[in-house]
């Protein structure tokens, strides 16, 4: 029932918010006129391949000359932004996505929320070096090769967090 559950009409778990891409007549909305949120999913780390796909779509739209693409993209200038907890970075799909995004050089931002605990265990029991930032240093962009720009900030410092996104 769309009236009682406007996010998914009862087809998702609670708290898995999404924006509607179709209007009430099931036609595509102009997605460039709204902020868009892809529904979250429950399996740990499973949002990562989808994040890569959204970023790749933005890159593809930069080269696409379709007359109907203006409802979906502003010339491929979108950035896909996703979040993941430090525990989920132990999942294989996280590293596959990180590597593929670096190879493809897609417009993607990932925020990793690292509280040193994953669901119920300390990072020392699941993360090499107990610090995902240390592991990812090899992906840092430099003058000789592609990679990422990586920033490490205190998530509790709101001003520092905002400045890192700008």
Predicted regions and their residues:
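Short catalytic-loop micro-motif centered on adjacent basic/acidic residues
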Residues: 82-84, 149-154
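Cofactor-binding active-site loop characterized by glycine-rich and histidine/acidic residues
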Residues: 1-104, 111, 122-140, 145
């Amino acid at each position: 029932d769309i009236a009682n559950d406007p996010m998914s009409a009862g087809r998702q778990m609670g708290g898995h918010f999404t924006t509607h891409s179709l209007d009430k007549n099931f036609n595509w909305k102009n997605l460039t006129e709204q902020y868009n949120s892809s529904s979250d999913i429950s399996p740990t780390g499973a949002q990562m391949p989808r994040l890569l796909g959204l970023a790749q779509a933005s890159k593809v739209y930069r080269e696409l000359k379709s007359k109907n693409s203006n409802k979906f993209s502003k010339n491929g200038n979108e950035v896909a932004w996703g979040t993941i907890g430090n525990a989920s970075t132990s999942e294989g799909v996280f590293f596959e996505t990180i590597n593929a995004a670096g190879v493809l050089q897609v417009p993607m931002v990932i925020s990793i929320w690292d509280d040193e605990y994953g669901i119920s265990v300390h990072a020392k029991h699941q993360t090499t070096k107990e610090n995902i930032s240390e592991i990812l240093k090899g992906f840092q962009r430099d003058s000789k090769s592609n990679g990422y720009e990586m920033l490490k900030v205190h998530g509790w410092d709101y001003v520092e967090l905002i400045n890192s996104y700008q």
